[in-house]
């Protein structure tokens, strides 16, 4: 049997049961009705319980805009601090560093950051962060924090259109998401490799089914019913291509054997919000290994794969319920990818790079 459309192989539950779950952030308020800060840590690759650890840190919180003073009031009002009010929610990824302190010290330092925010636009809408008041606990991340940081607005802000352009905006950190990295590294497949097309090859893609503790339908993420009748979401990631000698047929059984030999283990982390981590503990074919730059651990941040889904579920519980390998014929090389709506060289349309 040859593969002409798509074939599916379902991984055993044991491949994701150990670390395929993320606990939700507890959304609690104190007596002043202010959100209580909290730190959440996911562990990938058996990191050390004590001493120095490598932590990827992702800050979550609220955008707050400066209140406008009333035109009419007393003279004393001219010197009063108008304060800030919430105008949206978002995040600030500050990356990976070696950390020796404890979790609560890191949380306290993060909540004391003074972060100014500006909304702007280049090729895409961007959010600009400028950070002050960096405490010693955050010095491992200082090389990034001390410089201005820009991110795609649709990746770090739930509703960037709500951020005003004519007022001062601050980002107040409430939650800290950490991914503690052990023996596994944070490797992401290069875009050139992920976009690779080779003739007479089979593309191995992974479809990851998840359930989450938040209602997503009202936010534009429609859930579907799985085989058990339960609501679930799914997303896809690209693993790589496999190739046989010229003239040999690709069968479902052949592809299945290749996948089973890799002995893939799946975990969920908090890199960029929610992230999928794939660890190949078995043997990998030479063709596929070269595409992975001979790495065995791959990180897929949902922030890059599906930013809107990531924005909706990054504070909730997330659990892997099923993982499928999808075997599909590789796209022909003559197929072109059009990242822009306006295509070059079509009629009277011209585009200058």
UniProtKB/Swiss-Prot annotation:
Keyword Plastid: no
One GO term of the biological process aspect: virion assembly
Entry keyword annotation includes Ribosomal protein: no
One annotated Gene Ontology cellular component of this protein: viral envelope
Family recorded in the similarity comment: Belongs to the morbillivirus/respirovirus/rubulavirus M protein family.
Keyword terms of this UniProt record: Viral envelope protein, Viral matrix protein, Virion
Stated name of the protein: Matrix protein
Job description of the protein: The M protein has a crucial role in virus assembly and interacts with the RNP complex as well as with the viral membrane.
Molecular function terms, GO-annotated: structural constituent of virion
Taxonomic lineage from the root: Viruses, Riboviria, Orthornavirae, Negarnaviricota, Haploviricotina
Pfam families the UniProt entry points to: Matrix_Paramyxo_C (PF23765), Matrix_Paramyxo_N (PF00661)
Subcellular location: Virion
């Amino acid at each position: 049997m040859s593969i002409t459309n798509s074939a599916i192989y379902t991984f055993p539950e044991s491949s994701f049961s150990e670390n395929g779950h993320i606990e939700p952030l507890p959304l609690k308020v104190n007596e002043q009705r202010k959100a209580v800060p909290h730190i959440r840590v996911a562990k990938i690759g058996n990191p050390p319980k004590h001493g120095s650890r490598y932590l990827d840190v992702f800050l979550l919180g609220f955008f707050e805009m400066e209140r406008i003073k009333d035109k009419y009031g007393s003279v004393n009002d001219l010197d009063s601090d108008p304060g800030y009010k919430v105008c949206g929610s978002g995040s600030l990824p500050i990356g990976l560093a070696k950390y020796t302190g404890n979790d609560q010290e890191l949380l306290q330092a993060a909540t004391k950051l003074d972060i100014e925010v500006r909304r702007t636009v280049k090729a895409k809408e961007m959010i600009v962060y400028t950070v002050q008041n960096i405490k010693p606990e955050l010095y491992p991340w200082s090389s990034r924090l001390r410089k201005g940081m820009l991110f795609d607005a649709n990746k770090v802000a739930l509703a960037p259109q709500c951020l005003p352009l004519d007022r001062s905006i601050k980002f107040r950190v409430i939650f800290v998401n950490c991914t503690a990295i052990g023996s596994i590294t944070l490797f992401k497949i290069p875009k050139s490799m992920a976009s690779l097309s080779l003739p007479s090859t089979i593309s191995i893609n992974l479809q990851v089914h998840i359930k989450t503790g938040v209602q997503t339908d009202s936010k534009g993420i429609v859930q579907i019913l799985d085989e058990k009748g339960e609501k679930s979401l799914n997303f896809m990631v690209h693993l790589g291509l496999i190739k046989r000698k010229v003239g040999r047929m690709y069968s479902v059984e052949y592809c299945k054997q290749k996948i089973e030999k890799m002995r893939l283990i799946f975990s969920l982390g908090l890199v960029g919000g929610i992230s999928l981590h794939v660890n190949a503990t078995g043997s990998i074919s030479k063709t596929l290994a070269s595409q992975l730059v001979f790495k065995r651990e791959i990180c897929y941040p949902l922030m890059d794969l599906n930013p809107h889904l990531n924005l909706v579920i990054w504070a909730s519980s997330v659990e892997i319920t099923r993982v499928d390998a999808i075997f599909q014929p590789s796209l022909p090389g003559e197929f072109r990818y059009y990242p822009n709506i306006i295509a070059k060289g079509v009629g009277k349309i011209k585009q200058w790079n």
